[in-house]
């Protein structure tokens, strides 16, 4: 029996890539890497410089699977991992549609539960917006600015109460897009916003917008010929305002400016801004 357990744990360590002493760090820290095909494609296609790409990896804790896929971790404001989406990209930085996205949670379920489909289906997976952890990091930065201003005020520096209030309350607005790729790229080029991603048109819900309710929120759905994406997200925004009092709007930027051909291709904000 002891020998059986020994072989089992040895195989498990090999499967998870831990043929070394046990690593107690969170999973996203263990897997954080700029070596994915996605990260290399960002630079080679001119979306980012090498330095910008490294910043984005740190910002979103991007990971890399053994087979070169990028791991988009979904981490909440408390630093808890909800899940991780493994996606594959071609050298031109477009999705490799021959390789379907996979969830880290599903891989773990299959690893530990085998082929018991009924048991696997009975264990739900919870998701949040990609980039949700940035909200708490933003709050920490603003709190430190507030503390510094308060200290200056006490020591006699001419910092008024209104200025203290501004430092404490003006959090950056949040932009929500469909694709994780879009959020990653635009975070380096339009840093006046915090960039989050729903992970798909139908992945955005009012509940997922609740953690953002202290921020001004702007939704940027992809475009299409029939306004389906815009209408869908407009309904979600209305529900978030009704349930949680969110200050949320849906940007008509793509609907007003995209050409009929671009709408037919269902472009997103990166496609429009970079025109690649």
Which sequence ranges carry the predicted segments?
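TOPRIM fold recognition
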Residues: 147-149, 171-174, 180-276
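TOPRIM metal-binding catalytic domain and adjacent DNA-binding surface shared by DnaG-type primases
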Residues: 1-82, 115, 275
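Intrinsically disordered, low-complexity regions enriched in Ser/Pro/Gly/Gln/His and often acidic
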Residues: 20-21, 96, 226
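Intrinsically disordered, low-complexity regulatory regions of eukaryotic regulatory proteins
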Residues: 13, 17, 21, 33, ...
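Residue-level detector of bioactive/disordered segments in secreted/extracellular proteins
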Residues: 24, 128-130, 248
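Aromatic side chains
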Residues: 28-30, 56-60, 89, 100-103, ...
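Serine/proline-rich low-complexity intrinsically disordered segments, especially terminal tails, linkers
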Residues: 8, 26, 124-127, 138, ...
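Phosphate-handling DNA/RNA-contact segment within nucleic-acid enzymes
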Residues: 71-213
């Amino acid at each position: 029996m002891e020998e059986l357990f020994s072989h089992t744990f040895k195989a498990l360590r090999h499967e998870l890539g831990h043929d070394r002493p046990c690593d107690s760090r969170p999973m996203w820290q263990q897997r954080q890497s700029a070596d994915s095909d996605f990260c290399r494609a960002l630079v080679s296609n001119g979306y980012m410089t090498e330095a910008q790409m490294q910043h984005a990896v740190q910002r979103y804790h991007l990971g890399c699977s053994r087979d070169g896929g990028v791991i988009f971790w979904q981490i909440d404001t408390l630093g808890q991992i909800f899940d991780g989406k493994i996606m594959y990209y071609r050298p031109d930085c477009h999705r490799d549609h021959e390789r379907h996205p996979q969830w880290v949670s599903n891989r773990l379920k299959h690893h530990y539960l085998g082929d018991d489909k009924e048991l696997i289906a009975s264990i739900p997976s919870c998701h949040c917006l990609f980039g949700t952890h940035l909200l708490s990091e933003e709050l920490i930065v603003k709190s430190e600015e507030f503390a510094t201003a308060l200290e200056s005020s006490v020591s006699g520096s001419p910092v008024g109460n209104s200025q203290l209030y501004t430092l404490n309350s003006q959090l950056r607005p949040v932009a929500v897009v469909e694709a994780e790729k879009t959020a990653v790229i635009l975070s380096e080029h339009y840093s006046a916003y915090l960039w989050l991603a729903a992970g798909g048109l139908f992945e955005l819900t009012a509940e997922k917008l609740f953690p953002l309710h202290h921020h001004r929120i702007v939704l940027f759905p992809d475009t299409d010929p029939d306004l389906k994406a815009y209408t869908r997200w407009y309904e979600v925004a209305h529900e978030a305002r009704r349930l949680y009092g969110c200050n949320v709007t849906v940007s008509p930027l793509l609907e007003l400016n995209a050409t009929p051909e671009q709408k037919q291709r269902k472009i997103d904000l990166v496609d429009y801004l970079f025109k690649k």
